[in-house]
């Protein structure tokens, strides 16, 4: 068996459907967006879209339509999933609770039937008498809409027109009437039928039209007064209603194909049309009033409004605002203006919604060397193509920033005794101190009576008895708040300079070299209580009061130079309670006592970014449980701040980190800032609950996220990225991309728009000795689109395109790797290509090209001709492994810098994917699942170890460990195969057993090892091993990790219990949704835990949690079982959420 846990790190972002209507109430205008398995419900307000609820469906949304049957006060929602689960949903609000009620449900799958090539079509009769579905060729399925019916029952009507392209119900018909475009050997035609519910048959329709445009693809039913239907083709738009026929062929729509439409006015006089290039059109129906008062159609007109994201769906909201849902790029809210701008566009983007889909390729890199992966994806396509940099962390939202270099410390201050909020910020510099006054959001420099400004401040703050304190290198100064005046000053008896200081509201400890002085703060007096001498100089100290000690700390923590130790001293006596040798050469730079979740800790940060932390006993001063983590590479400064009424520690360094506690374990979270030298909390009128942060050049004031989440940065390419790899030595990414060019009259081609490959800092073009120009058998014609492929070299810091290398005409770049080969010290970018001609079934020629990038120049060092397409390449033990059509081939890199074939393996249909580990090679085939090869270095050949004999059409593969192999296939399933080394017969050993099966509901394009969270920081008890990330067509990022058998069994038990407690939307069984399902077979899921379901435990109410836990047995750690509590499960699930 194989035990795995699959969970979503980023929910799908590609929009595949949107509708508008009155779903939450009769008054609300709602926008409903389908993102594969997620349904998002918004209310349209004057300020924009307000999210109301997000629903996870147990299915891929194939049809989503709002309708209002007679007697209903608001709209109901009909949904059909890809596995044919149909349901009617209603929105119910009880106080703060929002429920999506399933009014009716059922599965409408047929046992036999060929799913139509044009996909699932679902339509609702305008009078709400029935729902029509076109699922299979030659059948039209009808679901009658009776109010009482809880179960959706359907019947089929035979359709002799097998190839239906699109179908709609017409308006204003006595009986429900469908109008459809279909194809037969003669061409495409339009036909109508009446649907008889009683006879369960079609009756002859009111009209038909034979031989419409050969590319006619969409039917739009027009409401009354016009009635009838509009048929949209590639070149023409026609209107039919039986009596009237009107056709127009506007040249502007020919350039591309119209893919979506939406009605603007209820009477159907205007329609929005969107095409594949992202252009938005308005179709206008001009009316003519007849003598008898009826209205007929006079003319059709199409106007180009402007450009949007490439639309998958459009919906008109209100007041000229349109939602553009996109699958290939970011979705948008756009405003349609009455007047055009300088570019002639009527469209203005108001808001953009990030979409990572389709993720075509991705790589995990640790760009900032901080032990945390960032994911860089090739996202989007055509003009929406981009790179997305995704990292997990805590965001800081900047509210103000001031250029102020050289800050050495900062503190908030309340200058008057009656103030609740901070109104000043004290900044320390070498040799001087400045005070900033905060007035609302305004910041101006000011002076404070009693403060000195010509010395560096070590500490400043509000202290007991309505006083302020300033500790500088020369003295400790106590200043009264009313009136502001110096009331007491303490200097070192011999006039030496203070080197380190710490202060709380009642106590001060300062260090002068090796001497320590302890002072107490009284009204208008600083009283020296004690002093002592340490054996080495003091590097850092802290007297933060912990527990309920009335603001007095009984302990003082210090870090010393020379012997590199941390010590706990008792106050006021300076008695040594504990001495901890930290080891190494690097001195402690910052020390802090703090309390997390009522446990006390000592944190001590060194000058190289290392952090030690210990449990601390307040009574004895003893340290326990020593642990160490690395937070950065530079000296770290520790400061506490409060957020959500819990204490957190901010570690300032080149890798700023927030430290907090969860389930009594310390958690370290990245902050999404480059570097922070100093910080302090700030709570002023203009900047409530904020942080002030200083780096080398700037002071920033901002608020901090309460939780860790994925942050996404976009680098637009305006063309399609295909493959990405990272090259550390040159600090660059290599990206394969393609742009579309159009053949012009002179025989050359021109780019449609500026994009990454045409705007690079430098560029080069392939010339090849391998292929003479006469090899191109294919002549392109005027106006034809051609793909131009490039290798882009992109800087890892600025993401600037440093170089673009263009491949040959008709040459498609398919695979990319950055690696060293043999004993050659250079690192190369290697690209695999194919010569693609329309008349060839599969490519017969291709190249492997070896590039070297250094000093801003890209050189092509070697090229190797191959007889086919180079689908995949990986570095393999210092050699190059490539899959070419059906062959897996290993190349050596010779001293002459040439690729020489070492061995081949031929037993595949089409070897698309390669992954390696040690001497093992996993091959993913187009249709023959996966195969495991071993390379025999002594014999210099491949041996076929085992294969999966199930026919799976693969979309991506990955090696989990030595024995387990992960695959994704084209029916949206995941499976794990296992090598059976213990099998007794050879035949059994040659079979890879399918030990894990699950339906993901997403098309996976890429797997890669890596993680989005800080690795091995702090303590973890997550029971998971390894981490494989995957990216999908819908922009979802997921994670697969392995479990032990005992954890799998516990989580499986929990999963089954959750399924009884959590009611699914649409009453779809979880077991049905996750069952492995292809055209050949359906099998129950096994070997996979649904992490999304497990994590939903944290969102249910306490009584429901109690239901899940009832009689659940867990291990008590000593091998005995005990009954689990709700808190046990919360802890376990919270641990699991932390892996992504």
Swiss-Prot record:
Region listing for WD repeat beta-propeller A, in residue ranges: 13-356
A Pfam family reported for this protein in Swiss-Prot or TrEMBL: Beta-prop_RSE1_1st
Region (WD repeat beta-propeller B): 391-708
Stored InterPro entries: Beta-prop_RSE1/DDB1/CPSF1_1st (IPR018846), Cleavage/polyA-sp_fac_asu_C (IPR004871), Quinoprotein_ADH-like_sf (IPR011047), RSE1/DDB1/CFT1/CPSF1 (IPR050358), WD40/YVTN_repeat-like_dom_sf (IPR015943)
GO cellular component, one term: Cul4B-RING E3 ubiquitin ligase complex
Matching SUPFAM superfamilies: Quinoprotein alcohol dehydrogenase-like
Gene: DDB1
Subunit note: Component of the UV-DDB complex which includes DDB1 and DDB2. Component of numerous DCX (DDB1-CUL4-X-box) E3 ubiquitin-protein ligase complexes which consist of a core of DDB1, CUL4A or CUL4B and RBX1, and a substrate receptor, such as CRBN. DDB1 may recruit specific substrate targeting subunits to the DCX complex. These substrate targeting subunits are generally known as DCAF (DDB1- and CUL4-associated factor) or CDW (CUL4-DDB1-associated WD40-repeat) proteins.
Keywords tagged on the record: Biological rhythms, Cytoplasm, DNA damage, DNA repair, DNA-binding, Nucleus, Repeat, Ubl conjugation pathway
Family: Belongs to the DDB1 family.
Main function: Protein, which is both involved in DNA repair and protein ubiquitination, as part of the UV-DDB complex and DCX (DDB1-CUL4-X-box) complexes, respectively. Core component of the UV-DDB complex (UV-damaged DNA-binding protein complex), a complex that recognizes UV-induced DNA damage and recruit proteins of the nucleotide excision repair pathway (the NER pathway) to initiate DNA repair. The UV-DDB complex may recognize UV-induced DNA damage and recruit proteins of the nucleotide excision repair pathway (the NER pathway) to initiate DNA repair.
WD repeat beta-propeller C: region residues: 709-1043
PANTHER family per the UniProt record, alphabetical: DNA REPAIR/RNA PROCESSING CPSF FAMILY
Metabolic or biological pathway: Protein modification; protein ubiquitination
Biological process per Gene Ontology, one example term: regulation of circadian rhythm
Signal sequence, renumbered to the chain: none
Domain of life: Eukaryota
MF terms (GO), sorted A to Z: DNA binding
Name of the protein this chain belongs to: DNA damage-binding protein 1
């Amino acid at each position: 068996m194989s035990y795995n846990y699959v969970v979503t790190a980023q929910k799908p972002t590609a929009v595949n459907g949107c509708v508008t209507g009155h779903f939450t109430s009769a008054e609300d205008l709602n926008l409903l967006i389908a993102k594969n398995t997620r349904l998002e419900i918004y209310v349209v307000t004057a300020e924009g879209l307000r999210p109301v609820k997000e629903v996870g469906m147990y299915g891929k949304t194939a049809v989503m339509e709002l309708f209002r049957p007679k007697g209903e006060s608001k709209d109901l929602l009909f949904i059909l999933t890809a596995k044919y689960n149909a349901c009617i949903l209603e929105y119910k609000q009880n106080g703060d609770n929002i429920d999506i009620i399933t009014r009716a449900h059922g599965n409408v799958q047929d046992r036999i039937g060929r799913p139509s090539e044009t996909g699932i079509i679902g339509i609702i009769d305008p009078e709400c008498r029935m729902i029509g579905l076109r699922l299979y060729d030659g059948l039209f399925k009808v679901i009658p809409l009776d109010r009482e019916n809880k179960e959706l029952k359907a019947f089929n009507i035979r359709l002799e027109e097998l190839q239906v392209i699109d179908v709609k119900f017409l308006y204003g018909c006595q009986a429900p009437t469908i109008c459809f475009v279909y194809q037969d050997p003669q061409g495409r035609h339009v036909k109508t039928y009446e649907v008889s519910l009683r006879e369960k048959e079609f009756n002859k329709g009111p009209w038909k039209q034979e031989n419409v445009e050969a590319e006619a693809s969409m039917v739009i039913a027009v409401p009354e007064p016009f009635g009838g239907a509009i048929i949209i083709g590639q070149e023409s738009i026609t209107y039919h209603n039986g009596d009237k026929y009107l056709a127009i062929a506007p040249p502007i729509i020919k350039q591309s194909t119209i893919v979506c439409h939406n009605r603007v006015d209820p009477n159907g006089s205007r329609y929005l049309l969107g095409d594949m290039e992202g252009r938005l059109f308005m179709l206008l129906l001009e009316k003519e009033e007849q003598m008898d008062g009826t209205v007929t159609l006079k003319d059709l007109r199409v106007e180009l409004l402007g450009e949007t994201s490439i639309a998958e769906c459009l919906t008109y909201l209100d007041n000229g605002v349109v939602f553009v849902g996109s699958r290939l790029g970011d979705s948008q809210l756009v405003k349609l203006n009455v007047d055009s701008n300088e570019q002639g566009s009527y469209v203005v983007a108001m808001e953009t919604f990030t979409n990572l889909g389709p993720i075509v390729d991705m790589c995990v890199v640790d760009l900032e060397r901080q032990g945390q992966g960032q994911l860089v994806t090739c996202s989007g396509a055509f003009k929406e193509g981009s790179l997305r940099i995704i990292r997990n962390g805590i965001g800081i939202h900047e509210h103000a920033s001031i250029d102020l270099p050289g800050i050495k410390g900062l503190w908030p201050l309340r200058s008057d005794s009656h103030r609740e909020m901070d109104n000043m910020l004290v900044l320390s510099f070498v040799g001087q101190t400045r005070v900033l006054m905060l007035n609302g959001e305004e910041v101006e420099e000011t002076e404070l009576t009693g403060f000195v400004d010509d010395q560096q401040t070590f500490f400043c703050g509000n202290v007991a008895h309505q006083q302020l304190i300033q500790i500088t290198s020369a003295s400790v100064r106590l200043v009264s708040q009313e009136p502001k005046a110096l009331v007491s000053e303490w200097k070192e008896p011999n006039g030496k300079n203070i080197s380190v200081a710490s202060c709380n509201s009642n106590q001060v400890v300062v260090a002068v070299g090796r001497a320590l002085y302890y002072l107490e703060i009284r009204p208008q007096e600083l009283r020296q209580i004690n002093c002592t001498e340490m054996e080495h100089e003091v590097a850092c100290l802290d007297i933060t009061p912990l527990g309920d000690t009335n603001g007095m700390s009984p302990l003082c923590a210090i870090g010393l130079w020379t012997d590199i130790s941390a010590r706990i001293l008792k106050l006021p006596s300076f008695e040594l309670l504990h001495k901890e040798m930290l080891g190494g050469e690097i001195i402690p730079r910052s020390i802090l006592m703090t309390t997390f979740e009522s446990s006390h800790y000592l944190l001590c940060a060194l000058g190289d970014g290392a952090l030690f932390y210990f449990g601390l006993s307040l009574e004895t001063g003893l340290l326990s449980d020593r642990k160490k983590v690395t937070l950065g590479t530079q000296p770290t400064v520790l400061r506490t701040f409060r957020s959500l009424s819990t204490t957190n520690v901010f570690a300032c360094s080149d890798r700023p980190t927030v430290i907090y506690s969860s389930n009594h374990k310390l958690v370290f979270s990245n902050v999404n800032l480059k570097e922070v030298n100093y910080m302090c909390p700030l709570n002023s009128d203009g900047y409530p609950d904020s942080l002030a942060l200083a780096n080398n050049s700037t002071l920033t004031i901002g608020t901090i996220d309460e939780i860790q989440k994925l942050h996404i940065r976009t680098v637009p390419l305006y063309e399609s990225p295909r493959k990405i790899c990272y090259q550390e030595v040159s600090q660059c990414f290599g990206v394969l991309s393609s742009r579309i060019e159009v053949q012009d009259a002179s025989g050359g081609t021109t780019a449609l728009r500026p994009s990454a490959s045409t705007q690079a800092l430098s560029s080069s073009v392939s010339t090849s000795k391998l292929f003479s120009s006469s090899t191109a058998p294919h002549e392109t014609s005027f106006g034809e689109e051609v793909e131009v492929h490039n290798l882009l070299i992109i800087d890892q810091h600025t993401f600037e395109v440093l170089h673009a290398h263009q491949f040959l005409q008709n040459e498609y770049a398919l695979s990319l790797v950055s690696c060293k080969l043999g004993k050659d010290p250079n690192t190369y970018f290697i690209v695999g290509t194919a010569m693609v001609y329309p008349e060839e079934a599969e490519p017969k020629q291709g190249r492997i090209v070896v590039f070297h990038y250094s000093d801003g120049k890209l050189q092509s060092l070697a090229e190797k001709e191959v007889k086919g397409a180079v689908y995949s390449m990986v570095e393999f033990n210092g050699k190059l492994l490539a899959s070419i059509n059906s062959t897996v081939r290993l190349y050596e890199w010779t001293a002459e810098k040439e690729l020489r074939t070492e061995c081949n393996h031929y037993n595949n249909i089409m070897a698309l994917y390669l992954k390696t580990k040690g001497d093992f090679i996993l091959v993913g085939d187009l249709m023959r699942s996966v195969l495991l090869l071993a390379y025999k270095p002594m014999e210099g050949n491949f041996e076929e170890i085992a294969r999966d004999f199930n026919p799976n059409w693969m979309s991506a593969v990955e090696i989990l460990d030595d024995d387990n192999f992960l695959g994704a296939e084209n029916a949206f399933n995941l499976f794990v195969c296992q090598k059976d080394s213990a099998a007794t017969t050879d035949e059994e050993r040659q079979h890879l057993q399918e030990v894990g099966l699950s339906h993901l509901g997403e098309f996976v394009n890429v797997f890669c090892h890596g993680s989005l969270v800080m690795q091995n920081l702090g303590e973890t008890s997550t029971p998971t091993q390894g981490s494989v990330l995957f990216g999908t067509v819908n922009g979802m990022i997921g994670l697969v990790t392995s479990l032990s058998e005992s954890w799998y069994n516990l989580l499986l038990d929990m999963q089954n219990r959750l399924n009884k407690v959590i009611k699914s939307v649409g009453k779809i069984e979880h077991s049905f949704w996750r069952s492995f399902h292809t055209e050949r077979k359906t099998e129950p899921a096994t070997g996979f835990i649904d992490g999304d379901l497990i994590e939903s435990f944290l969102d249910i109410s306490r009584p429901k949690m109690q239901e899940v836990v009832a009689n659940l047995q867990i291990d008590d750690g000593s091998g005995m079982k005990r009954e689990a509590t709700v808190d046990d499960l919360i802890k376990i699930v919270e641990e699991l959420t932390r892996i992504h």
